[in-house]
Regions:
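N-terminal targeting/export leaders
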Residues: 23-141
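Bacterial N-terminal signal peptides
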Residues: 9-19
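Charge-rich, low-complexity N-terminal segments
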Residues: 2-3, 18-25
Length: 141
């Protein structure tokens, strides 16, 4: 009995000490009518400093120059808790070595909790407000 209790205590300690992504939220982007082949997801997790780590991965996202009308760059936005859009960076589309598959990824840290993530195609990556169509969006977290 003593041996079983020792083993259970050890297992409980390991479960507590092993870092996991259990606290991370993963939300897929909704299907896009503008770039229908694009698929991706956003993972958001709170770090030990109470900041939010935001990771975005997208497959089959066409280059913004191939859109109609063409644009220069994709911009990633988040909707904050006060329902305001915030530009959090640009996304570069590239092909992997020895592959024709277009991939895009993005990672940032925010002190503000994101409620929703969306992507627009813009002519300038530093825009603070968008007038253009949303290319991809998530549901609320």
């Amino acid at each position: 009995m003593k041996k079983i209790n020792s083993i259970l205590m050890l297992l409980a300690a390991l479960i507590i000490l092993i870092p996991t992504n259990a606290c991370a939220q993963r939300v897929k982007f909704s299907n896009s009518s503008i770039v229908p082949a694009a698929e991706g997801a956003v993972k958001v997790r709170k770090d030990k400093n109470n900041n939010y780590l935001i990771k975005v991965n997208i497959d089959n996202l066409a280059a913004p120059e191939r859109l109609t009308p063409p644009r220069q760059v994709y911009v990633l936005w988040m909707i904050t808790e006060d329902n305001m859009p915030k530009n959090i960076g640009k996304i570069k589309v590239a092909t992997k070595f020895l592959s024709s598959k277009l991939k895009a990824s993005f990672e940032t840290v925010s002190s503000i909790k994101p409620m929703r993530i969306f992507i627009t195609a813009e002519n300038d990556a530093s825009v603070q407000y968008t007038d253009y169509e949303v290319i991809l969006t998530t549901n609320n977290f």
